[in-house]
Structure formats: C-alpha cells, structure tokens
Amino acid sequence: MEKKVYLVLENGQFFEGNAFGAEGEITGEIVFATAMTGYLETLTDPSYYGQIVVQTFPLIGNYGVIPADFESANTHVKAYIVREWCQEPSNFRSEGNLDTFLKERNVIGLCNIDTRQLTRIIREYGVMNARIVNSIENLDSIVSELKNYRVTDAVKNTTCHEITISKPEISKNKVVLMDFGAKKHIHKELEKRGCEVITVPAYTTYEQIMELKPDGIMLSNGAGDPADNVSIIEEIKKLLQTKIPIFGICLGHQLVALANGAKTIKLKYGHRGANQPVKDLVTGNVYITSQNHGYAVDHNTLPPSCSMRFVNANDNTCEGIDYQEIPVFTVQFHPEANGGPRDTMFLFDRFITLMGGNK
C-alpha cells in the first residue's frame, strides 16, 4: 500500500498524495517544468539544485532510466513531483524504472496529486518554498519555517573540484569550460566541433585560466541567484578584457551581464521547459528553445556597449546579448538541449567562428 504524504506550500496550502522513490521529509523551492520528455535530464541537471520539481506532463517515466541521457553523474533536485509514474517502462535502452532510480539516488518522490492545480497555484503566487512531510499536525509551524528557506551555495555544491581535459582525435581549438554546474551536452557539442575541452572549477582565477592559453572560454549553466557569485564575477571582468572569445549559457549569460554592470531580476515563476519561443532581434527569426532559469537579465540596465539579441516571445524578457566591443555573446536558453529542441545549435558554430574557425 502506498504511503500517504503531504506537500505543504509557503502560502499555507497543502496537497495530499503518495510517496514513491526515497522516503523522508524535505524542504526546497518549488518550481514546475513543462517538457513532455527529458525527465532524466531534468533530474540530473545541476541547474535544479535546491528545488522541488513538479512535472506538468501527467505520466512520467514511460521510457525508464537510461544512464546515457544523464546530464551529470548526480541528481540535484530536492524532490520530484508527478501526477503518475510509469511502473512498466518500455524502451530497449532502459535499465530500470523511475521509482527504483529515485530510491537509489535518495530523491524523495510524490505522486497522485493534482499537478495541474499545483502548477496554477505557482503561476498565480509565484515560485515559493515547500516541504514534503509525513504529517500536517503542526501545519502553522511548518509554514512559518518555510518562509526562512533560501537556496544557497548552489555553484559551490555543483561545480567540479579538479581540472579535467578531453581531446577529440583531431583538436582544432582549445576551450576552457568554467563549470558552474555544467551539463554534459555542452561539453559534447564543443568536442563534436573539434575542441579540446579543459573543464575547470567555478572558482578558478583569471591567472590560472590564462596559464592554459585558451582559444575560447565557455561559461556554463548553473543554479541559484547569479548575484551571489561575487568572486566569480570579478574574475569574469578580467577575462572580458583579454579579447578572448567568450560564449555564456544560462548562468554564464547572467554572470557576464553582471560583470558589465547590468542587473538581474527574479522571475515570478521562471522558464522551465522545452517549448519556449525566442525571437532573434537581428534576423527576425523565432526559435523554440529549452530553458531552465528563475532569474533573467534586466535589459533596461544593459550598458550602451551591449545589445539584446534574443527576446522571449511570451514575456519579452532578455534571452541573449551581443557585446559590441569584445568577441563575446551569451544566451539565457540552452542550445545544447538533449532531447531537443535543437533549433539553436548553430550558436556553437558561431563560437567556433569567433575563435578563428577550424584552424
């Protein structure tokens, strides 16, 4: 018999559901993700660090567990909420089911709740803190404690701890990848284009990076409030003065903007899913993109040397920036998205061109 558990929201509302995966109680920032596929990528994406993720698609786990699709070696979500999970997955690549996977990774799961209603609440009230508990006898006390929770040290807890180097058979460009919680497929797309990729920890200094003599620098995705990363922003300021080509994705995009004096804002409920339309303000083209972020660059604070290149077609928030005086461009969305869409993969080719093409 499935164990009864509860989801308590910071605004005092609660849901009754059933436990699956690991059992226990956990607190996190609750967000929703709208993608119909890619649940394995979601669970292993470091950008979800500290968060309780709600899947809006009603049935999750249909194609089982496929390690080759993981975005990192670890799971980073605090807990995982679905309407229903598939107990008998069907896929020739599958190595297990979702319930067993969550148990092995000690990730608490919650099922059999109205995820549609829960998503509506998050849309109306905005992202908030939540807790999965075994009892709601002390509801007022739980709600009071929730108001004090904050995701902290996200980059510190998701970055690598040592430098690693990977080379394709024919290496044409040397790229330093600053790992703020990098997804595996950023690395893959660079290597596919003939790049030697040197992955370095987030707190690597300007001087240490210069010793590696890179042709280009990639600033990865990551979790948390971008403004918290004060020391990293200072190092990026120095890197921007070198005129070495730089490509930033997601958190990397935000950190470059902050290094240029712009500001970031927290979105009401963020962009998390694989169906976000983005308009290129130069060409007029519209692309469908994969996104996972709760903060955005405030385009009204950009200095004159920057121009907004991409804008979200739903809410007009900043999705990409071109820097006019230096070989730098950044995007808020994920061109490397595994499982798709792959409309903006050409941005990796633009980065290669900035480095001088295939030498």
Predicted regions and their residues:
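Short clusters of small/polar residues that mark proteolytic maturation junctions
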Residues: 19-20, 57, 291, 322, ...
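RNA-binding accessory domains that recognize and position tRNA/RNA substrates
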Residues: 1-207, 211-212, 226, 338, ...
